[in-house]
Amino acid sequence: MADCVIRDWQGKEAGKATLDLKVAKETTANDLMHRAVLRQQAHARQGTASTLTRSEVRGGGRKPYKQKGTGRARQGSIRTPLRPGGGIVFGPKPRTYNLAMNRKERRLALRTALMARVEDVTVVKDFGTSLEAPKTKEITDALGRLGIAADAKVLIVLTEPSDVVRRSVRNLEKVKLIAANQLNVFDLLHANALVLGEDALATIQEVYGDD
């Protein structure tokens, strides 16, 4: 269980919230989160890289020159891997990089990652609701008021990010905005600072706090 300070859009304290999630044992936590990150990165790979073997390359059916009498090494095809334009030996073929991890482990890894970063969490009440039009400076100023460094990698988690907030954030290279139902281990561990909307915190507690 961890207590989080709730701040308003101006960075002033506006209350407190509690995050109570079941986490993995200390002896297995690092391994569990590591496997979850590996799985997420592996699933992001397309696995479509493909090369042609000597049997698949077009041409090469005719013997390039006679077997004997030329003084050169014997050759049976111009598509041998020894020649330019020939087939590839042991090259990549389409494959799946998917790694298996059951649902219970995935949820436990996510809860463990979030609780491990709880000291870097800032809960904000009504994040961005006062924005009338997309304005990047409003977001950077708000993050500054929350005490987040300008060069920090920031993950903002909202229940239903508005279009205004999305457009205000998209030009910030080190700021990533995701919905609460898109929460993942990699983003939680990769960011230097986590900004959660008050409603997003409630959603996370509701969805992941029942195990």
Curated annotation (Swiss-Prot):
Residues 60-71 have a biased composition (Basic residues). GO terms for molecular function: rRNA binding; structural constituent of ribosome. Residues 41-87 are annotated as: Disordered. SUPFAM superfamilies: Ribosomal protein L4 (SSF52166). GO terms for cellular component: ribonucleoprotein complex; ribosome. The keyword Ribonucleoprotein applies. Part of the 50S ribosomal subunit. One of the primary rRNA binding proteins, this protein initially binds near the 5'-end of the 23S rRNA. It is important during the early stages of 50S assembly. It makes multiple contacts with different domains of the 23S rRNA in the assembled 50S subunit and ribosome. This is Large ribosomal subunit protein uL4. It comes from Parasynechococcus marenigrum (strain WH8102). The lineage of its organism: Bacteria, Bacillati, Cyanobacteriota, Cyanophyceae, Synechococcales.
